[in-house]
């Protein structure tokens, strides 16, 4: 008898506890904090509805499609232990709701509208299960871990980097000089800071030229392949691509992008160009803490990390566990595995809500960066293992004798840790001793150890598992 107008509870349509999830569904785990008086089933169903086919009232055009085929479903709700009135709502989305190969569209659907929803006090997307059918529509990282090692001819150890400081204010020539000294001293990479784009004191083209000169000179002197992450991030996609093309013409191995401020569409565009043209792509996560730091609202970084692997990047900053920036060990290692490994089992103790199969999509190297120095080297080597990039900005440039000795100190410390580990020593217990022994052979390392012997950044992590 026609359609029934009016408002009805979301849970009547979108809460389906008997639903068996399909292998092709995108699964989401939301941390839901309902407004007082809103039952969790209604809150979970509201999230499923508003992030898929639903709207606030019944509409007659519902009759022109098959809601059962296209609607999101809240299929399970569980209370969060130790939190009052907070729940994990599991939502399944049919694959047809999403455009192939578009992280942009995936996020617009899943987190686009629902976070401002009145029935919720707060909402956080904790994890996503990306089905293999959807993974296969993405190129993913331009090259991945193995191809990067082959390009650089560097095996069996973490890679070493350094962010050039002061991040703003240097002229292009002085900037290039700092790059040369770091690379000559033994680092594999130097890095543009995330906010170095093309400012009045240093235009991008000048920086690219001087940095290329620096890395070729350092390569000739050391016999090692060197790189500098040239930041191609720009105000328009066209300008970004112009910078990437110039980097390729210079013959440098790697460019860089700020993927959250630049946006997923720009990032995926750049990643495709990088694969087609043999450039590695370093990703900085500037702005991530705005989205991921609050425990009960936003998007957890593990979701942003998965999204980056799909969109494309060969390196991404992933916290340090030991430095000045946020990151708890188990949670950090959880998303480090999601970045690097091909198959990751569900493991709630590390914050992993779903088993994820990447079906041979290349992996991403996690970058540890922020407030770290030579005394942290044993812990970093143990925590992150070989497939990582360890980046020391102040920990290189703050060396009392200058940049090149700072780079020497870091390289000696790293080689000492890798050697000790390969000999079967326990880096966690004997770390300080290993560094002290290496100081005997390296005055540069001894000087670095003097400067930073007491520094620790110790505050409790804001975002913990409980």
Swiss-Prot record:
Coiled-coil ranges per UniProt: none
Q: Which PROSITE patterns match?
A: RUBISCO_LARGE (PS00157)
Report the main location listed first in the record. plastid
Top-tier EC class? lyase
Residues bound to Mg(2+): 191, 193-194
Q: What is its EC number?
A: 4.1.1.39
Quickly give the catalysed reaction.
2 (2R)-3-phosphoglycerate + 2 H(+) = D-ribulose 1,5-bisphosphate + CO2 + H2O; D-ribulose 1,5-bisphosphate + O2 = 2-phosphoglycolate + (2R)-3-phosphoglycerate + 2 H(+)
Q: Which Gene Ontology MF annotations are present?
A: magnesium ion binding; monooxygenase activity; ribulose-bisphosphate carboxylase activity
What's the name of the protein?
Answer: Ribulose bisphosphate carboxylase large chain
Species: Drimys winteri
Q: List the gene name.
A: rbcL
Q: Name one Pfam family in it.
A: RuBisCO_large
Is Metal-binding found in the keyword set?
yes
